[in-house]
Amino acid sequence: MEINKLQVEAIKSGSVIDHIPEYIGFKLLSLFRFTETEKRITIGLNLPSKKLGRKDIIKIENTFLSDEQINQLAIYAPHATVNYINEYNLVRKVFPTLPETIDRILICPNSNCVTNHHLINSSFILKEDQFFNMNLKCKYCEKEFYKKIVLSCQ
């Protein structure tokens, strides 16, 4: 008989971002500005996972992520799930899907891009090349980059 024990304390109401690849949890806290709130946030790092081997998890009390926020998670955590909790019960489970654009959370690798010199939020259009590689095109400088290059700038 397998005993399930919570590695991170349960929340009464709010959002749980589960199945985050290991070492990505802190990055998501920063990029999505989750720490700019008065709400209690609990994070678990390098937890055992059957799916991933190791995973991170973020629990945000009394906060429900928007569909836009959930889908933007997919660029970093494509297999994550977002669980909405109410009265300690799961009321909705959402699987992120890549949006057509990613706004505000990425930095353009082009040092000459206006977003790197002025208070302008970045915006990238997601594109796939003929080999199904994910590329991101900056809305402002119009340069296109491999996903790996953009994510390494963060």
From Swiss-Prot:
Q: Has the keyword Metal-binding been applied to this entry?
A: yes
The record lists Zn(2+) as bound by 108, 113, 138, 141
Mind listing the UniProt keywords for this protein, alphabetically?
A: Metal-binding, Pyrimidine biosynthesis, Zinc
Q: Which cofactor does it need?
A: Zn(2+)
GO MF, one annotated term: metal ion binding
GO BP: 'de novo' pyrimidine nucleobase biosynthetic process; pyrimidine nucleotide biosynthetic process
Where is it found, in Gene Ontology cellular component terms?
aspartate carbamoyltransferase complex
- Note on how the cofactor is bound: Binds 1 zinc ion per subunit.
List the InterPro entries: Asp_carbamoyltransf_reg_N, Asp_carbamoylTrfase_reg, Asp_carbamoyltrfase_reg_C, Asp_carbatrfase_reg_C_sf, Asp_carbatrfase_reg_N_sf
Q: Which family does it belong to?
A: Belongs to the PyrI family.
Subunit details for this protein? Contains catalytic and regulatory chains.
User: What is the annotated role of this protein in its UniProt record?
Assistant: Involved in allosteric regulation of aspartate carbamoyltransferase.
What protein does this entry describe?
Answer: Aspartate carbamoyltransferase regulatory chain
Q: Which organism is this entry from?
A: Buchnera aphidicola subsp. Acyrthosiphon pisum (strain APS)
Task: From the UniProt record, report the name of the gene that encodes this protein.
Answer: pyrI
